[in-house]
Amino acid sequence: VFNVSFAASGYIPALLILAAFIPFVWGLGSIASAGVLTFRRGSGAIGFLAFALTFTSGAYFPLALFPSWVAPLASINPIGIAITGMRAQLIGGAGWHDALVTIAKLVPLSGITLLLGLYAFRLAMRRERRLGTLGLY
């Protein structure tokens, strides 16, 4: 399809990049859960954040089309980092060095997001228990 060939040597590095990215998603989910617990709403804010991250990831069109002030923000977007790294492995035939550079960028971002998410969820649960409103769900 579309005259694209996948590099078999990129499967394992792409899976490792995906594994480094997954904790970021868990962290976002925990932050979203904490927001819903605390405010009884949050789908609008969560949807906007997901839209902003996805829109600036380069998944739908090249980042070069963005204004110059968006480029620095897009360069630290974990979704964009993961997509670019996996594309390079599967389609571009990039090597292990490129995969390790991508993983080195993703691990701190994923770790920080996961820790923030767990902390936010813990605070939200503590608040709901203290107020006695956990049973409202």
Regions found by a protein language model. Give the residues of each.
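Membrane-water interface at transmembrane helix exits
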Residues: 2-3, 32-36, 87, 91, ...
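Short alpha-helix boundary/capping motifs
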Residues: 63-64, 84, 101, 110-115, ...
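Transmembrane alpha-helix boundary/anchor motif
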Residues: 26-30, 61, 65, 81, ...
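Alpha-helical transmembrane segments and their short interhelical loops
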Residues: 1-46, 97, 101-118
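Transmembrane helix segments
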Residues: 33, 37-80, 84, 88-89
